[in-house]
């Protein structure tokens, strides 16, 4: 329905957006390159939680690129604010932000995507849209303004979606460390009685029942890459960036 908030499985709404990298047409800019993209909104530039998020996204930028995924931010701030904030982050924290940020001072884009906070029409919530190479929305995530995102989980989601697409499998909870089937991927269930019976008799898959079968078609590299995201999210940083930046500034 035109004007309604988009849903998972729908094509991302067509729009032209102004960013600090210039005007970008969504989703065609990425679809024409055969790329997925992650659009994520933040409440405001020059705020602490948002700064920590952008540093985290930037430090994982190459991980997203290896997956064939581009990043694009969004807030109701101006292009000039985005530019100065990026400069501040690089100068004071030592991290360059390589991806564009949409400037949406009127809230037009945020309103179209359902990203405005119920109690503040001037701030976007921490939303995430994961959009595939066809321009179809595959995942939508919403976080409150006071909680920063776990960027390694967003990487894991993208990795799992792309792997599931290529192998025609569904991905279980906590993959690749699921407590029932480990790194296994779930085989789509049969749709007829004959198929269900044949599946149980064939022994092709490991099964708890005809509707719950799995195998392990993912490569070791794919599994270990996903585990690396989880390990990094759980590990304590060897050194805090603010300490490095403070040393550099002084």
Curated annotation (Swiss-Prot):
The keyword Transferase does not apply. It is found in: Cytoplasm. The active site is at 50 (cysteine sulfenic acid (-soh) intermediate). Belongs to the peroxiredoxin family. Prx6 subfamily. The keyword Disulfide bond applies. GO terms for biological process: cell redox homeostasis; cellular response to hydrogen peroxide; hydrogen peroxide catabolic process. Transmembrane segments: none annotated. The active site is a conserved redox-active cysteine residue, the peroxidatic cysteine (C(P)), which makes the nucleophilic attack on the peroxide substrate. The peroxide oxidizes the C(P)-SH to cysteine sulfenic acid (C(P)-SOH), which then reacts with another cysteine residue, the resolving cysteine (C(R)), to form a disulfide bridge. The disulfide is subsequently reduced by an appropriate electron donor to complete the catalytic cycle. Changing residue 207 to S: Reduces enzyme activity. It comes from Aeropyrum pernix (strain ATCC 700893 / DSM 11879 / JCM 9820 / NBRC 100138 / K1). Changing residue 213 to S: Abolishes enzyme activity. NCBIfam families: PRK13189.1. Disulfide bonds join 207-213. This is Peroxiredoxin. SUPFAM superfamilies: Thioredoxin-like. Its main location: cytoplasm.
